[in-house]
């Protein structure tokens, strides 16, 4: 075969003039190259120093195959789909198990990324969930929580992606302690939905961190239970309660507007009336304590929504994921790609509020 002949000739040239080294037979090996499986007879030398250039070329092709597999998997293709594409490109059929073996390195890389050290301080941290179909004993939706942070240089990064089957205070304590163990010492403000138990454990792990509950989620939950004939008016009232144009607003004044709103609608809607009875709802107004130029950036978790759209686009071509590990791996790949893109651009409005820069 031509490749074997090339390697034999290459060894002959290599050994010319080397009195202390000679040929030492061949070893068999198999590789994929030029669209098919190749049986190679690799020449050896007695000192074990000879390395044919042909092998380097084949290794380059193998690396290209792995890189392409990673990229296709990261874009949501299944191992079967990747195998079909590889067969068209390289002319050799790759089974699901073969592709899984190739992508095992990809799994390891994503795990290392999720466990990487984090910065000591983050100006703001956002937590939001995306729900994906996961196959365990049966197929069902599970929540994956994305934690995104604004760094001291005003750029963003995904700090963690975590699968929590059910919310609880102990679960959130474990999550926050996890990012603390990876190096986080302080957080300016943490923005989240009304997640069960989170408000209780934040001060236990990051004692000086302020908590802002997502106003957009609150509005959505309120309006979902309002009759169509009242929706426009309730939405307008909520717009006045959470008025972003009032630069001199205070938490106390805004919260009183919230109580008045609750009392106004309590006869028609019990769920709105109940809002006035929960003092923890004051956490929806934490954003007012900060400079008016960043209030729109910290009163909602919508900053993660752009990333969630990328997640949904990637998972759209998958009916369900075979395991939560595979879902975590795919989410990690998408997040890493976005960190190299728009998340690298600084959000300079955060420089207007020095309170968020305080290392606590």
Annotated model-derived regions:
Residues 189-196, 201-239:
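Conserved beta-strand -> loop -> alpha-helix junction used to position metal-binding or nucleic-acid-contacting
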Residues 64-76:
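Short, amphipathic alpha-helical "recognition" segments used to contact nucleic acids or chromatin
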Residues 2, 18, 27, 77-124:
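Electropositive nucleic-acid engagement tracts
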Residues 1-56, 345:
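Short, conserved DNA-binding cores of transcription-related domains
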Residues 41-46, 53-58, 64, 92, ...:
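RNase H-like nuclease fold core
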Residues 241-360:
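Acidic/histidine-rich catalytic cores and adjacent linkers
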